[in-house]
Amino acid sequence: MNLTRQERRRRERQAYKDSRKKDSDTYEMSIKLLQPWSTPIMKTELPPKILQTMTEISDQVIADKDAESWGKNLAGQINTELLIEHDILNQTGMMAFFLGAVRQFVITCKCQQMPFYSEAIQKEEWITQMLSMWIVSQYPNEYNPAHLHTQCQVSTVMYLKVPEMLPSRKKHRDKDDGSILFFGNASRDIDLSVPQLVCEPEVGDFYIFGAHQQHAVYPFRCAEGQKEIERRSISFNAIFQSKTDYDRGKKNEVPQAAVRPGESRPT
């Protein structure tokens, strides 16, 4: 069969397309990213009911002239840092919520730490206990220098109030002012990772991270004469242990002074 030049070229183009289509077949594959050498930062949002309750609790504590200042135990260059007693958390049901959140974080981290034992980790019972919880009522020009938390294993921060802030002076650094900064040291690969994470706070944001995770909080500025200038957050520290280890008598090496009698019951 004699083909015209035009028909021959058409068939050649079609054959080329068919070969490309065959080479570009897609496949469903199960993928796991294995990263046992770093502790994740878990970010979520407080349910509206939890956010409202914690805001009301913080309002009560700040209004209480006899509230205990917790600043002597903290790194922040911040004037108002107040302790929240565990009784009110138990009475409002907040304690159970936060211990459950810590438990989920621990399970997630343990599964990443030992990815080939994730099934056993998820079947394990994990005991969590809250140590101290405190309010950080931050105002313009106050800040938290780089630091970590000691005598605990897990730390958190939740944001209850975030004021309108003046924009950063430099457009190429527009996310610095008022942000929380997490530092990492697990990877030197600058092509596929970065050594720090800058997070702009929003009302309801809730972060859970390892207690030895270095972090800092940048100061911020507000417009002159602005009325609402408070950035309010709440943090707490916690410890955990597997029920298996607890039953074996392998208790955490945490000084007894870290948990005052009656502060929190393991759950």
Predicted regions mapped to residue ranges:
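Short regulatory "switch" loops immediately downstream of catalytic or recognition motifs
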Residues: 106-113, 160-168, 220-223
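Short, charged beta-turn/beta-strand-edge "cap" motif at the junction between a beta-strand
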Residues: 212-216
